[in-house]
Amino acid sequence: MAKPSDAVRIQDTKVALSTASVYPESTATAFEIAARLGYDGVEVMVWTDPVSQDIEALRRLSDYHRMPILAVHAPCLLITQRVWSTDPWVKLQRARAAAEKLGASTVVVHPPFRWQRQYARDFVDGIWRMADETDVRFAVENMYPWRYRDREMQAYAPDWDVTKDDYRHFTIDLSHAATSRTDTLDMIDRMSDRLGHVHLADGKGSAKDEHLVPGRGNQPCAEVLERLAHTGFDGHVVIEVNTRRAMSGAEREADLAEALAFTRLHLAQTVSPVPGGPATRTDRR
């Protein structure tokens, strides 16, 4: 049993709401909901909503709702191929500039699509070069193979399993881990001290990327959060769940309130701190 003097609550781990979590509602609605429910901040998914692409509009929302922007998700999705540019490096440069201007500590990046051949060839070295030019973390996110019936397609390069390549920081997405049928805790072990950002959502291993509310699938969401608390994780935990099936605004908010309560409960477990905690590497391995 831990002594009172050993008890620790992770004060620096902020819980943010991804603006994608309110889709099909707007980016502005995400700020409003995050403030009302008591989130620590937001992660802005840059996509087809014009407000998500407008730094000054985002700054006004952040100021009005007193909701810090903790991370910017670069426009890496199929539906955002023309957002900010058709050049993937320009997208990342603009995401970095947005993060710097808005005070966000992290830019979330997906690995390239396989058909982006030159971008994929240059990606690992290019991410290192960009990371060397800023204090903003470029946290590369684990993805998954695309599946249809019994067929599997490798859609990402160098690999959907980002731990196979050398990045300074990683994002772990638990829904993506479920879709790829990967052992999440093993992946976190491979990321080690380079884990810089967490997308918290649940999944059941479906071929579809489910993004369920934590606790509604088979991912070790609680164990992951407790491990983060135990190791002194210094990044952010972002709720990135799918609420498209919500029948009303009240139902959507109830799901997002449940996700926040789950996350804070398991980050606040009483543990014995690990001396020193994890350190973030800044050199290549």
From Swiss-Prot:
Q: Which Pfam families match?
A: AP_endonuc_2 (PF01261)
Protein name, per record: Uncharacterized protein SCO3347
InterPro entries per record: IolE/XylAMocC-like, Xyl_isomerase-like_sf, Xyl_isomerase-like_TIM-brl
Annotated coiled-coil segments of the chain: none
Q: Which family does it belong to?
A: To M.leprae ML2432 and M.tuberculosis Rv0498.
Output the PANTHER family linked to this UniProt entry.
Answer: HYDROXYPYRUVATE ISOMERASE (PTHR12110), PTHR12110:SF47
